[in-house]
Amino acid sequence: MKTPKTLPEVTLSWEISADEITAILAGSHSNPFAVLGVHQGGDAFVARCFIPGAEEVTAMTLDGGFIGELKQLHADGVFAGPVSLAKLQPVRYRARRGDAEWAVTDPYSFGPVLGPMDDYFAREGSHLRLFDKMGAHLIKHEGAQGIHFAVWAPNAQRVSVVGDFNGWDGRRHVMRFRADSGIWEIFAPDVPLGVAYKFEIRGHDGVLLPLKADPFARRSELRPKTASIAAAELEQVWEDEAHLKHWRETDKRRQPISIYEVHAGSWQRRQDGTMLSWDELASSLIPYCVDMGFTHIEFLPITEHPYDPSWGYQTTGLYAPTARFGEPEGFARFVNGCHKVGIGVILDWVPAHFPTDEHGLGWFDGTALYEHEDPRKGFHPDWNTAIYNFGRTEVVSYLVNNALYWAEKFHLDGLRVDAVASMLYLDYSRKHGEWIPNEYGGNENLEAVRFLQDLNIRIYGQHSNVMTIAEESTSWPKVSQPVHEGGLGFGFKWNMGFMHDTLSYMKRDPVHRKHHHNELTFGLLYAYSENFVLPLSHDEVVHGKGSLIAKMPGDDWQKFANLRAYYAYMWGYPGKKLLFMGQEFAQWSEWSEAKSLDWNLLQYRMHEGMRRLVRDLNFTYRSKPALHERDCEGEGFEWLVADDHQNSVFAWLRKAPGQKPVAVITNFTPVYRENYTIRLPSAGRWREILNTDADIYGGSGKGNGGRVQAVDAGGDITCSITLPPLATIMLEPEN
């Protein structure tokens, strides 16, 4: 054993008062940094520590140099004594109990990691890299490697990080409070990556709360476990610069966008019924989407959530890809794989509300921190969830940073923002007296408006390749217009009116459709008021609504014919496209998150025909500029037949500057119509580029033999065409 150095005369007390020892042992001391660790008085230094189970403790420098033997002040593990140091520095202890010996690096001997500017920007709400500061990060600090933990809990009396590394003992790593920001932090030396942890919080009233998961955790345990996991920084080698450059430099409104909406846990499953990993999904889902011609995959929420039947919409970990499909690196590999073949990835993102699971954000520090305290603003009656407090800068910053995190760290191409209408209206799903008017007496949630505007400004300002899409079900104006023009700033908005009206029409027996012609024509009155996405989403095939094929009237042949005609009608209609998985091959059953899609149906001609049709629709839409370049501008659409309600026929022209127009003609009755006269913009031969009644799609094979002839009949250019039953055809001039 080394000979102890001569210790300087101590000019400060190295002992600890009985009250403070009691508080440390009880876990009620709010600032152990003031007591434990290394402290200086003049030229003298003392070290104090709390090491449960130790009978003897020796203090050392980080490189192992002896600096003093500490005296036991309490049998439960409190030690203190003078140490021989030239300056304040971190120390390590060698603890002994009987024959057992172990080393402990003192977390209280390290200085803070965060600085005053972090406090300032965090409090102001303008910190745009909180995800690099908050949560758990492996760093090297003052000569030691460990995990830096940081969490916002301004009203807590005490916050500790607990986990595998300290036996889940909240007395061991009590965090340092930063009064200027309300953030608690601690550097935990020698703690490795991969450990499970939570925060133990004593609320403002002194009551110990249930253990909380880390709001900024980048990885979580697999349900039913709920702890956060200290994750490494992503080390993905990205190979997608060409993909990102394309979307940075193009007007997304004038690009073909056809989105395949996917629930990652039920698209396909293993033979034993378990979920695929990200790498397994990549090997099958990516080539499938490439073959099908989709431009984007939109995932239902993949952020961590405890309850499978919530489909991810009740998330408890906004920064953590769910552990159901493996580690976060797997998701990064999946996105990279998509980008290498030109497929974009969109995340269904839920900033409107969060669940009240005890390990989540609810009453995080014993107060309504992330939510409103008044349930008239802070509780969502439809979903029994808490509503974010959009008037609090730290909460808005948490959400905006999360959007930036997904764009930067995972290279996501878009965010589909869920439940925007519930955010915009204070009286959403509330009766009279159950809501609080805004400062002007109205029902608009002005705080949510400002949040959404700020979100879009930040996203488009830092990641111009990303698009934001609003699921907004009302007529709120200018959802997809720029903020500087008074809009919310979204890139696109779901056209819920199109979905509702067209499905209402399609469910009707064809004999009655002539009485509801306006259900399909009305939508063109507002089709260009926003930049629309036409959604046939998961919402339309759950909760007893039946699948899309099951909604169609008639016998099986008519059901398939109706759906084929409807799909081509939609792909020819102005707006970007979205289709939920399984509907591309007309799955009969409603979607269930608990099992795979019914892929066995593809062995049957009608289902395989539907899949081939959707594939051809995608490639036709993408290859014909007239069908996509003016999706969001009225100049790209011209009615050809709008008022033939008697025959339930609709026809229009899709156009783009300098490009061949495409005529879209739909017959929504089972009547085979020959010699139907239609006006066209130019004489000559027009080629039938798509016919949903083709035999290859499962149809009857009726049509125009591939071409029609338009003739100039004294100023009016018309052609006589054959309209197959329950079918849509598309025509394009040959020259």
Curated annotation (Swiss-Prot):
Which EC number applies?
A: 2.4.1.18
Give the active-site positions: 418, 471
Alphabetized Pfam families for the sequence? Alpha-amylase, Alpha-amylase_C, CBM_48, GlgB_N
Q: Which GO terms describe its molecular function?
A: 1,4-alpha-glucan branching enzyme activity; cation binding; hydrolase activity, hydrolyzing O-glycosyl compounds
Q: Give the pathway listed in the UniProt entry for this protein.
A: Glycan biosynthesis; glycogen biosynthesis
What EC class is this? transferase
The terms describing its cellular component in GO are: cytosol
Reaction equation(s) it catalyzes:
Transfers a segment of a (1->4)-alpha-D-glucan chain to a primary hydroxy group in a similar glucan chain
Q: Name one GO biological process term.
A: glycogen biosynthetic process
Q: Which UniProt keywords apply?
A: Carbohydrate metabolism, Glycogen biosynthesis, Glycogen metabolism, Glycosyltransferase, Transferase
Q: Which CDD domains match?
A: AmyAc_Glg_BE (cd11322), E_set_GBE_prok_N (cd02855)
Role played: Catalyzes the formation of the alpha-1,6-glucosidic linkages in glycogen by scission of a 1,4-alpha-linked oligosaccharide from growing alpha-1,4-glucan chains and the subsequent attachment of the oligosaccharide to the alpha-1,6 position.
What family is this?
Belongs to the glycosyl hydrolase 13 family. GlgB subfamily.
Subunit and partners: Monomer.
UniProt name for this protein: 1,4-alpha-glucan branching enzyme GlgB 1
Task: Please name the source species.
Answer: Rhizobium etli (strain ATCC 51251 / DSM 11541 / JCM 21823 / NBRC 15573 / CFN 42)
The gene coding this protein = glgB1
